[in-house]
Amino acid sequence: MNAMLPTHSLSLDMLLAQHANADAQLTSDTRALKPGDVMLAYPVGNVQQTSDSRIYIPQALSLGAALVLYEPSDLSEELVEVCKDPRCVPVKDLAKQVGVISGNWCQNPSHHMRVIGITGTNGKTTVSQWIASALNTQNQPSAVVGTLGAGLLN
């Protein structure tokens, strides 16, 4: 199972379906991992500050992860040994694929709803509330996700 998966592919979806239960969660945080879940382990950040969930691969395996998908580049010698476990699957450029992998695992919920993104420096919260309110008046239930929280507009 340790053959390199260079890009997201149908084979990765099939691998997840074969080795993880349908109710398994995908996580990069071992504190949230339960037996049977799938760990996504990869470095994130920039030159000044990096966080690397790959250091938790041994813990994920001991907690009973069904699979560990990990970024294989620049892996320490210790982790190279740990990742010989058949539950570990190297995925090149994993950080760039997490959104697609997660979306596919959850049957792409955003494909079945209208999503409106608001960008800019000022006024995003106000505009999001206005849009949600306008949609609600048309009997289109709306939720808002932003820096002030997330939820349905009453």
Question: Over which residues does each language-model region extend?
Answer:
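N-terminal leader/targeting and accessory segments in enzymes
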Residues: 1-100
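Phosphate-binding loop of NTP-binding sites
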Residues: 96-154
